[in-house]
Amino acid sequence: HMPWSIRALEAGKHVLCEKPLAMNAAEVRQGIEVQKQIGKLFMEASWNRWHPRTIRLNEIVKSGAIGEVKKIRTAFTYTDLDPANIRAIYELGGGGLYDLGPYSVAAPLWLMNFAPTSDIKTEVKWHAGGSDETLKVNFKIGGVEAEAITSMATADTLYFEVTGTKGSVAMGGNDAFNSHNKPSTLEIDIEGKKSVENFEACDPYQLMADSFSNKIRGRESWLMPLSESLKFAEFFDEVFKVMGRP
């Protein structure tokens, strides 16, 4: 994605780029330098960050309602991937970490304000195309235990759960990272008092695109900064090292 994004920037275009923004942190740094020189908007399209449910989960955690965060669990898996699909070819950016990691693996990072990470451990099953077919990453972030799962070869499983000293909050249903145009829920448990918050159907892709276009027009709107994309890429580089990939 990055080489074409750079070409578009150099052609004077604002760029909303499909995730992952790049194959590694070095490429992201290159893109950041080009963006600074050109002055056009450049953002990684992590649409789930605009979903009202995601925003609300973040608010609940940051408010301290569930107490001090102790554990974060995420998963984004699906099955029946065609072996010839580009998503399975490592050299072309394939694999669960590249394809699904920007959702499930990145979530603990932004939720914990990119606190220092440590103790990265991985369990991986390799695809015939050379990519990571199924991956579990366990790590600590700011002292919080985190577990993130990605897979292109297991039953559809999507969750985002945060547990604290006073309770927990979790995305209801089986759609934590693929809720498009349908109602969704948050399940909250604070000191034994359980509740459910409901969210109307929405198109988070449109919300993201609207935010990007509003910024182009000079209107106030939130964009995910490239500094966050760089931190994601740096962490993914570390995960790849532990996995045994280049």
What positions do the PLM features span?
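Structured catalytic cores of enzymes that bind and process phosphorylated ligands/cofactors
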Residues: 4-5, 9, 80-111, 117, ...
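Contiguous beta-strand/loop segments that form the cofactor/metal-binding neighborhood of enzyme cores
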Residues: 105-178, 210-219
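Predominantly a Rossmann-like dinucleotide-binding segment in NAD(P)-dependent oxidoreductases
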Residues: 41, 48-121, 126-127
